[in-house]
Design a protein with these regions (language model features):
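Short, small-residue-biased leader/transition segments that mark boundaries at the very start
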Residues: 1-2
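Long, compositionally biased tandem-repeat segments
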Residues: 6, 27, 47, 68, ...
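Short, T/G/N/S-enriched strand-turn elements that build extracellular solenoid repeat scaffolds
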Residues: 14-20, 34-40, 55-61, 75-81, ...
């Protein structure tokens, strides 16, 4: 069907249904079911729905801009793409399990919660902004930007084979970050603000040439790596670096209010300054190529260290 403007209460375009427009197009109504269907425009596409948008195994594509406003969006194994700016806003959940949301320009996503698990892909070639609540990026999920990436979320899960990454500056403000065997990195700079929440980086990687870690509570870096080419500081209530790596090519400053555990772990930098209430470095290595300072107010265990 060739169309330019479509305004009805309920739109059903399921199972190989096709809607195509050569011009700028507006789709408005209560709900849209594009499961297995195709909605394609050669210019801008604006979708405005009071209720749900279902794009399960469907295709929504614009050669111009793409704007979606809906109560909720389910794009499981579906695709939303635009050559221009892409803006998605949902009052409820945005589900992109195994799906693809991509823009050749800027990408802006606002939702109450976000499920990008099961190899879901969210990708912007220019500045990318994601604002959500609970964010599930496990099971191979990918949130990537070829430009800057700004992420604001509540609890973030970034599991095995999953990535949150950018070519330029990456800024993340979250209330908790659970990254078991996932990767969080930038080719330029990374600022991670936990807002006094927990950081779990078991078997994970956090890396950037310039790294800033803010407002950490407890940090679990067992078998993980937190590293930077430049100087960085890690301030936390407790830090477990057992079998983990904390590495800086310049200076590394650790300020741990209570317990620092680094059993068989590595802490290494050009200049290293460590302060904690308790330290267990059994089988671990604290290494500096220059100045080394270790201050412990309480018990020190350094068996085989």
């Amino acid at each position: 069907m060739l169309f330019r403007s479509l305004r009805v209460a309920q739109i059903i375009n399921q199972t190989q249904g096709q809607l195509f427009s050569k011009g700028a197009t507006t789709v408005a109504g209560q709900s849209l079911d594009n499961s297995g269907g195709s909605l394609v425009t050669q210019q801008g596409l604006d979708i405005r729905l009071d209720n749900a948008l279902s794009n399960v195994e469907g295709l929504i594509s614009s050669e111009g801009t793409l704007t979606v406003n809906a109560a909720s969006l389910d794009s499981t194994r579906g695709s939303l793409s635009s050559a221009g700016a892409l803006t998605l806003t949902t009052l409820g959940m945005l589900k992109n399990r195994g799906g693809s949301i991509s823009a050749d320009s800027t990408l802006t996503l606002n939702s109450a919660s976000l499920d990008n698990s099961q190899k879901g892909l969210i990708s912007g070639k220019r500045a990318t902004v994601v604002t959500t609540g609970t964010f599930d990026n496990t099971q191979g999920g990918q949130l990537i930007s070829s430009d800057t990436l700004d992420l604001s979320a509540a609890q973030v899960s970034n599991g095995v084979a999953s990535r949150i990454a950018s070519d330029k500056a990456l800024t993340a403000s979250v209330t908790g970050f659970d990254q078991q065997a996932g990767q969080l990195f930038s080719k330029t700079s990374l600022s991670l603000d936990l807002n006094h929440g927990q950081l779990n980086n078991q078997n994970g990687l956090i890396n950037a040439p310039l790294l800033m870690l803010k407002n950490l509570k407890d940090v679990n870096n067992q078998n993980g790596e937190i590293s930077s080419a430049q100087a960085f500081s890690l301030l936390a209530s407790n830090l477990d670096n057992s079998n983990g790596k904390l590495i800086s090519n310049q200076s590394l400053t650790l300020r741990i209010d209570q317990r620092l555990t680094s059993i068989k772990g590595l802490m290494s930098a050009q200049t290293l300054d460590v302060r904690s209430e308790h330290l267990d470095n059994s089988g671990g290595l604290i290494s500096s190529r220059g100045t080394l300072g270790v201050t412990v107010d309480g018990q020190v265990v350094n068996q085989d260290g």
